[in-house]
Amino acid sequence: MGNIFANLFKGLFGKKEMRILMVGLDAAGKTTILYKLKLGEIVTTIPTIGFNVETVEYKNISFTVWDVGGQDKIRPLWRHYFQNTQGLIFVVDSNDRERVNEAREELMRMLAEDELRDAVLLVFANKQDLPNAMNAAEITDKLGLHSLRHRNWYIQATCATSGDGLYEGLDWLSNQLRNQK
């Protein structure tokens, strides 16, 4: 009998877990975002060859965030991380107008993968502190997000170094997880 109440309590108040894959072109700010969320501070980063993985606790949800390197030579390896991914965070350097089409191509290629069909999409329009950064509406247009008819998605303007927008994005992800059956 006590076990029933323990399971009910855990179901109502227990921690949920969510597997998140964070990808984007190289130098978009993925690793800076990961460690800003994990440690609350800015870390000095070098290009990620392979991946970083950390658990971020937020609002009773344990996010396991896989930050995968974005250099073009290692992007084909992204697919090895797709299995069991519930949320995809795609990080865009909002200041990099020259590569936004490349970012769109990579995003659309990933979203076509069967293993990611049920994953929700959060786009971080990063580096909003830079003077020539595209705003979230412009990034939405350039990435073709409005064409995603059967995908739950959200875009959040962010600045990884200050942390602006990061927790708003996690709020959206946690609400999506809570609303899943």
Swiss-Prot record:
UniProt GO cellular component terms: cell leading edge; COPI-coated vesicle; cytoplasm; cytosol; endomembrane system; glutamatergic synapse; Golgi apparatus; Golgi membrane
Activity regulation field: Alternates between an inactive GDP-bound form and an active GTP-bound form. Activated by guanine nucleotide-exchange factors (GEFs) and inactivated by GTPase-activating proteins (GAPs).
Enzyme Commission (EC) number: 3.6.5.2
Covalent lipid adducts (N-myristoyl glycine), residues: 2
Keywords recorded for this protein, A-Z: Acetylation, ER-Golgi transport, Golgi apparatus, GTP-binding, Hydrolase, Lipoprotein, Membrane, Myristate, Nucleotide-binding, Protein transport, Synapse, Synaptosome, Transport
Name of the top EC class for this enzyme: hydrolase
Tagged with keyword Lipid metabolism: no
Region (Important for the stable binding to the membranes): 3-16
UniProt subcellular location: Golgi apparatus membrane; Synapse, Synaptosome; Postsynaptic density
Family, per entry: Belongs to the small GTPase superfamily. Arf family.
NCBIfam families xrefs: small_GTP (TIGR00231)
Record's protein name: ADP-ribosylation factor 1
Protein source organism: Rattus norvegicus (Rat)
Lineage: Eukaryota, Metazoa, Chordata, Craniata, Vertebrata
